[in-house]
């Protein structure tokens, strides 16, 4: 048991999916996994373990933003020995040719968070995905005939931003989309020597206004989830 996770040792698999929304964790467990058990309900942040295609896998809600995901990733790695962590979530497109419902696999993440600047004063640490996980996820997506993009994303600390000028400039430099957690996940994975990946579905476009409903975000992004699960069970 850790501070925010009440699981006993052995109840969490070495490979885990990390949705921000605990209701999405429940949806993934009920829709994709077999022989499911719920190991966590602390603060309503649900966690489940089951099997997918005969392989053991867990799914844990993390909440939104760098501080929240950092809590769960730290505890999953240090207290429960998790080795493969795959964030599954939504993002807002920045590039004109990135469309709603496209799948983005984050190769790396830039950020306006001070998390890494506190650890590396005067430096900008460049957190990156694990290549093996990335390739497996990319191959799984292309085999399904999906439009999968691989590249840089922005991990933002601010959801309601007063000006989008900096986001537009990052788009000019090739950043694909904006979300709120990947930098933290990749940095902590690097710190502890484990594998991490973010697989994201585009829920809206920052500049065109195209978007999906909140219900669709919870229940219909099955392709993203399948890609992540297929990558997880190959590790």
Swiss-Prot record:
The protein's name: Purine nucleoside phosphorylase DeoD-type
Domain of life: Bacteria
Quaternary state and interactors: Homohexamer; trimer of homodimers.
InterPro entries recorded: DeoD-type, Nucleoside_phosphorylase_CS, Nucleoside_phosphorylase_d, Nucleoside_phosphorylase_sf
Gene3D superfamilies documented for this protein: Nucleoside phosphorylase domain
Family membership: Belongs to the PNP/UDP phosphorylase family.
Site feature (Important for catalytic activity) residues: 217
CDD domains reported for this sequence: PNP_EcPNPI-like
Keyword tRNA processing among UniProt keywords: no
Catalytic activity, EC: 2.4.2.1
Function: Catalyzes the reversible phosphorolytic breakdown of the N-glycosidic bond in the beta-(deoxy)ribonucleoside molecules, with the formation of the corresponding free purine bases and pentose-1-phosphate.
Catalytic activity, reaction form: a purine D-ribonucleoside + phosphate = a purine nucleobase + alpha-D-ribose 1-phosphate; a purine 2'-deoxy-D-ribonucleoside + phosphate = a purine nucleobase + 2-deoxy-alpha-D-ribose 1-phosphate
Enzyme class: transferase
Recorded GO CC terms: cytosol
Keywords, sorted A to Z: Glycosyltransferase, Transferase
Catalytic residues as annotated in Swiss-Prot or TrEMBL: 204
GO molecular function ontology, one term from the record: purine-nucleoside phosphorylase activity
Binding site for phosphate: 20, 24, 43, 87-90
Source species of the chain: Bacillus cereus (strain ATCC 14579 / DSM 31 / CCUG 7414 / JCM 2152 / NBRC 15305 / NCIMB 9373 / NCTC 2599 / NRRL B-3711)
GO BP: any one term: purine nucleoside catabolic process
Positions with a binding annotation for a purine D-ribonucleoside: 4, 162, 179-181, 203-204
Short name of one Pfam family: PNP_UDP_1
